[in-house]
Amino acid sequence: MLPLVIFIAIGQIISRSLMKKMGGSDSLMFNMGKSDAKVYVKSAEGIKFADVAGEDEAKENLTEIVNYLHDPTKYQEIGASMPKGVLLVGPPGTGKTMLAKAVAGEANVPFFSMSGSEFVEMFVGMGASKVRDLFKQAKEKAPCIVFIDEIDAIGQKRSGGQYGGNDEREQTLNQLLTEMDGFEGNTGVIILAATNRPESLDPALTRPGRFDRRVPVELPDLLGREAILKVHAKKIKIAEDVDFNKIARMASGASGAELANIVNEAALRAVRDGRRFATQADLEESIEIVIAGYQKKNAIMTDHEKHIVAYHEIGHALVAAKQTNSAPVQKITIVPRTSGALGYTMQVEEGNHYLMSQEEMENKIATLTGGRAAEETVFGTITTGASNDIEQATKLARAMITRYGMSRDFDMVAMETVQNQYLGGDTSLACSAETQAKIDQQVVALVKQQHEKALKLLTDNRAKLDELAAFLYEKETITGEEFMAILNKK
């Protein structure tokens, strides 16, 4: 008996020693299969809907979830059950994660957060085990919210081949589908998930009964951008006379995360300059930093290069101003930036712009060719400065023909499909090689036509081109008001 007791004691000592060396009970070996979900317990000081600006439609959709978590009985009395899952879809930086936290904050319930990539492990079966553990914890804490960020990491469409795909990822997805089937809509566990690749998700995951509701979280419009700027401006010391509407118009197409970065950059610039608060100029400069990078202070152009860049930028602005339905010129500069731009012309729409006519798109192509056209008109030569303009003009002309049906030859036939619309919109042609050759010819003809229009506009307004270029050369940066004052001067 005594030798047996001694043997057990020695075994326990060795076991404790091994656990210490491996990091104790919290080590990887002893935590396999645990979800590692970040749990934010309910708190009255959490993120609320008031902290999320610019996404009114998404908030309206999610308010019903909050009401259910507050008072589920009124839904149960009528026999209604909440959606088991809500899928938040939209471009990066639009506030999908923040909205999910705001739902939990408004409902004052626990919030389990986990990224899709955290489920996939090197050991087969660990991902499925983590899913089981996550849902077990959620049911114990119900009512609560489970949030899976970047769900496309585990929710991608399964391959049709017998041996295709990632076995571990597919097992994890299968377990997630099983868990979502395993509880009713009245259990008090709401699953929120976010993705910017909804088209890649498995149909079994997005069908009714699993993710019943899809909530788009799009880029904010003008009013949304203004509201977001005001929310983030509360976090810094800022001048009282800041025109947030103007800043919002200048930041067209910016996401909520980018707008937050713009406000923060303005505060950092104020500190660098030794001021106690940020100003309108700080915010405007921050937008330019996001668009074109920081000013390149050590870049010194020759006088000849500076003249070329001045004419190039005035060429853009003059062609834009001489056409109808073009966005007003906000600013023109020939100060080099870290993005590689030696100068740029900023145009800002007066309000929201949801549609573009064929004429407007052609005018935009003409404006893009205006820089090169000015070089040809004045110097009789061309430079590499128009490389980005050429790329944008070609892309726009191709889209007119292949996607928007603005070609008489092809009429309303889609020649191009867009994939990953929330991640830049990769395109692929869906036509024969002969048709592709015809498309190329029409793209060349369209850009050439607008280039010739730009050349004519600049030739007809050569005196103003010279006067404005000389003014820009001297000042280096001019406002849209200064540009229009000289242009309209008799």
Q: Can you describe what each PLM-predicted range is?
A:
Residues 37-248, 254, 266:
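Walker A/P-loop NTP-binding motif of AAA+ ATPase domains
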Residues 184, 203-204, 217-284, 293-296, ...:
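Conserved C-terminal "switch" segment of AAA+ ATPases
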Residues 1-43, 400, 422-424:
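Long amphipathic alpha-helical segments used for membrane anchoring, targeting, substrate engagement
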Residues 10-12, 16, 272, 289-296:
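Hydrophobic alpha-helical transmembrane segments of multi-pass inner membrane proteins, especially
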Residues 297-308:
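Short pre-active-site segment immediately N-terminal to the catalytic Zn-binding motif
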Residues 18-24, 74, 146-147, 151, ...:
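Proline-centered turn/helix-capping motifs that create local helix->coil transitions or kinks
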